[in-house]
Amino acid sequence: NSNVYLTAVLPDWEDAITMGGEASIYYDGSYVGNTSLVPGGTEDTIQLSLGIDKNIAIKRQKIKEKCSQKVLDNDILHQYTYEITMKNSRATKIEIEVEDQLPLAQDKSVVVDRKELSGAKYDEVTGILKWRSTIQAKDSKKLTLMYQVKAPKYMSVAFN
């Protein structure tokens, strides 16, 4: 999904809101939806979705020149490289969090090796990558994601 979603983060929200119920959410003067507020919950911070931001674009592109497949003795080594481009068309700088995911091997004979993550935080259990970045007004940034998958020749490797 290449859409960019705005999210409002409200820390210590129960200090400001003492009654529960439905709340209407507006952003830039436009109605974006409803949410239920339930005081006494276990979370002290609440996240509210503000919808899609058309002023921020993101594109993930496979770099074919840096993708390859090599045969090594009894294994095949697949290399994948992607470029993630983020563009801020707003008049102000933005804080952005980008998520992607590396494949997770279901078989012990398959090895996924992280090569280039452009500083992403990686979760070993889920394979989720997270980048946090500031992009100045009317500017763009690029991230590189490169990984290798080594698998036995007899095995067909598929990604979901």
Regions found by a protein language model. Give the residues of each.
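Intrinsically disordered, low-complexity Ser/Thr/Pro/Gly-rich interaction regions
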Residues: 1-83, 90-111, 116-119, 137-147, ...
